[in-house]
Amino acid sequence: MTPGEVRRLYFIIRTFLSYGLDELIPRMRLTLPLRLWRYSLFWMPNRHKDKLLGERLRLALQELGPVWIKFGQMLSTRRDLFPPQIADQLALLQDKVAPFDGRLAKAQIEEAMGGLPVDAWFDDFDIQPLASASIAQVHTARLKSNGKEVVIKVIRPDILPVIQADLKLIYRLARWVPRLLPDGRRLRPTEVVREYEKTLIDELNLLRESANAIQLRRNFENSPMLYIPEVYSDYCSQNMMVMERIYGIPVSDVAALEKNGTNMKLLAERGVKVFFTQVFRDSFFHADMHPGNIFVSHEHPENPQYIGIDCGIVGSLNKEDKRYLAENFIAFFNRDYRKVAELHVDSGWVPPDTNVEDFEFAIRTVCEPIFEKPLAEISFGHVLLNLFNTARRFNMEVQPQLVLLQKTLLYVEGVGRQLYPQLDLWKTAKPFLESWIKDQVGIPALTRALKEKAPFWVEKMPEIPELVYDSLRQGKYLQHSVDKIARELQVNHVRQSQSRYLLGIGATLLLSGSFLLVNRPEWGLMPSWLMVGGVVVWLVGWRKTR
């Protein structure tokens, strides 16, 4: 480790101990050297004994800085790893840090634009940031070409070395988790860190975020439900993104929405429909839909429209995952736990040798109490969480796309019920899911598949006669080869039969000669000749087996 890494590790350990986070490690798992090491740090006591463990963990991560804050935010979505009281506290982590100097942002923009001054491309550039987070910050301006208001998002300078250094230390700590926690190996800490690293590195590439925003905008073009601001691709680079500036009401500001006369019931239901449309129609969903990234248009409040920003994190499901997920939801709400268990096995989410009866019983035990609530109060996100937690006991592998989906679903539910507490998610989602499943099977689905494949088959049609001829010719050669192999096998079979016959005769002559030599010495040389003949016949038979 470099001196810088040692200093950083010391700061991390001091922070963890000052918040009493060594309580996360069961005493029985502390080896003697670790106990002595902890006692030697008596001058680093827990200074926050009045706070609960979850709150102390949240405060410690905030003190460690942006990389750890974002790590905590990601961990808050993995409720299979932590008890609710800790996961709830991690969900409160706010990715808000002090802005960096606007002059640095300006210099970075000029570098991205080929060294030209900012006013060559933008008017009214505001040196003061509109918003600031751990990875990037945003400035406002107007496009010189058309006068449109835009926001310019720039990556923090020199953030990559900081992220790489902290990730290296997080990996080191993750390797200790299986040794220190009884359930550490099942938690797969290294996989969790690897997943976080991928998400974080993706967020550093604003070209990726630009492409995501363009795709989402195209998917919801002219939609009354969701608006994605326009991205000005000509101005975008890996470290800079320029997009349309929007004005809306934060979705968390319920009072302002009500004051604007917003139809709250319709707004809440549209949030659910937007989510399921992204997942099942488009297979491409905004996976960071927390309240800070969602606004509501001021216009036509009786027909409200969401505005989505910050498309750095997206998720996608393949066709099989979508079908299994939809059927899982429907089977669960029909209380068909056998079907739920079979779907998990069929999808490959759990090993194929899983005992379906045991799995069904485990799902029933965990999920049946949920139905003690009214249907309108049942949380889709917690249904998924319960199913995944149960499946993990049966060695379900981590499915990153499903983890993202479950996190997003919890956000959508939370926002929806904040807007309209009586929101019945199942009533809103069931027709959508049933319609989607119906659309995937039967004559319409077959017709659609044939239409999709028709251009391919039309293109390949001229090649079919040649392919048939080649197949017939290959078949002829194959038949010739098969006949040849059959003849060789037959010859080998005859040879093996002869060999066994000769070996038997040789052994018989050898044994007979030996017997006569011992018991009938008066027979003279006859026994010896029998033995010699037996050896010769046996050797001939043995040679035929080679």
Curated annotation (Swiss-Prot):
It is a multi-pass membrane protein. The active site is at D288. GO terms for biological process: regulation of ubiquinone biosynthetic process; ubiquinone biosynthetic process. Pfam families: ABC1. Coiled coil: none annotated. The keyword Membrane applies. One of its GO terms (molecular function) is ATP binding. It is an enzyme of class 2 (transferase). Its main location: membrane. Residues 124-502 form the Protein kinase domain. Keywords: ATP-binding, Cell inner membrane, Cell membrane, Kinase, Membrane, Nucleotide-binding, Transferase, Transmembrane, Transmembrane helix, Ubiquinone biosynthesis. Its EC number is 2.7.-.-. Belongs to the ABC1 family. UbiB subfamily. This is Probable protein kinase UbiB. It comes from Salmonella gallinarum (strain 287/91 / NCTC 13346). The lineage of its organism: Bacteria, Pseudomonadati, Pseudomonadota, Gammaproteobacteria, Enterobacterales. The gene is ubiB.
